[in-house]
Amino acid sequence: ITFADTRLDTPTGGRVKKIQKYVETDDFMVAYSDGLSDIDISELVRFHKKMGKIGTVAAVHAMSPFGIIEVDEKGNAVSFKEKPVLPGYVNGGFLVFKRDFFDYLDENSVLEEEPLRRLVTEGQLAGYRHEGFWACMDTFKDWERLNMLWEKGYMPHVGFRGKPPWFRDTV
């Protein structure tokens, strides 16, 4: 692992561009520091190589930060789910790229905007569907929730599996 000081004010794509001189392999990984997952990195890389695209993003399910209520046309609540897993996938923050990806970046690039959208437009982005554990730690509340899980012994990201103590059906 090589740590590179890319400065706090550098956009995400610019940060990746700044590490180009350290990447000596045909493929390289980018991982966000705010995601916690039991994703099999070896399988993600195998999938990336099998797909043959410039980029691969781990696609994960996210939990809604809000309760979801469905209301019919008369104003009756027909369902209520507290912070359910959202349909579809989000960027899980584990990505694999071919060296060619550096050509899509400059020092002002925001990785999640133009560079990834361009890969999609060109048919060069794959999505690895991860159905296991994934959680983000963007807020103090997220930190508290993840630490509570750890204290209760639910640690799928380090190999221990079991039913989470209060996530209900969110994982």
Sequence positions of predicted segments:
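Catalytic-core segments of class I nucleotidyltransferases/pyrophosphorylases
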Residues: 27-29, 36, 41-49, 61-64, ...
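Conserved beta-loop-beta/alpha segment of the NTase-like Rossmann-fold superfamily
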Residues: 1-71
